Amino acid sequence: MNAEPERKFGVVVVGVGRAGSVRMRDLRNPHPSSAFLNLIGFVSRRELGSIDGVQQISLEDALSSQEVEVAYICSESSSHEDYIRQFLNAGKHVLVEYPMTLSLAAAQELWELAEQKGKVLHEEHVELLMEEFAFLKKEVVGKDLLKGSLLFTAGPLEEERFGFPAFSGISRLTWLVSLFGELSLVSATLEERKEDQYMKMTVCLETEKKSPLSWIEEKGPGLKRNRYLSFHFKSGSLENVPNVGVNKNIFLKDQNIFVQKLLGQFSEKELAAEKKRILHCLGLAEEIQKYCCSRK
């Protein structure tokens, strides 16, 4: 990225929760990728007026403004699909926090729309930019997996806003697919105690070489945000990830990737591989949801 960009893309941030606030901070700070972007305002359902000197603007103004060329969608997952469609139809590039949609068909349709409009549609995956993932990637390369498991625990999450657990937890599924290739669903169960705000989803997957992988999402009051993993290879085992350092500026690293796409610096092959992985994960998440719901 050149230090002095020839032009800046006008950006609006939709949703100013945790992710949206980090995005606004990165856009305002002097980073190489931020030099290509100009934060014009933010959209929120709440009446906030301004945040740190950045003005709130209406959704209608964001869609119709010639100044706005890019939308960062940082709202709850249930609203992503509608926002993406509106901004693509208005001729804007879109960066969206994962999951981009809560169904495979919607994601495919939106990707087709982005291609028709000649716009970038980028789904954030900061989990692939974490130090832990870089460590795992090095550890598993060239090894034959015998079996593996990944358990994620956290506090409760509202399904109405963030989607079925296979969608809200899609970053864990993305880790497994990125490490071991495309996966197929063997079975899935969902245990829920709504009165206790507790849920546990257990998914049995297998690799193309038929090695079993289990993925568990467990959420409830008092559960700390944690990841436990165990991978057994022909050449040894990996039990959990050592402390590999702090994840610095992962949203900024994701923004760098997005700007490279805006500038046409990604090859068609790289873009196609990323799209294939994202759609594979969304398709698996949908399959898991259908499997669990059919057994209720």
Swiss-Prot record:
One Gene Ontology term, aspect cellular component: cytosol
Catalytic activity from the UniProt record: (4Z,15Z)-bilirubin IXalpha + NAD(+) = biliverdin IXalpha + NADH + H(+); (4Z,15Z)-bilirubin IXalpha + NADP(+) = biliverdin IXalpha + NADPH + H(+)
SUPFAM superfamilies, per the entry: Glyceraldehyde-3-phosphate dehydrogenase-like, C-terminal domain, NAD(P)-binding Rossmann-fold domains
Pathway linked to the protein: Porphyrin-containing compound metabolism; protoheme degradation
Residues that hold NADP(+) according to the record: V16, G17, R18, A19, S44, R45, R46, S77, S78, S79, H80, Y98
Species in which this protein is naturally found: Homo sapiens
UniProt name for this protein: Biliverdin reductase A
One GO BP annotation of this record: heme catabolic process
An example molecular function term from Gene Ontology annotations: nucleotide binding
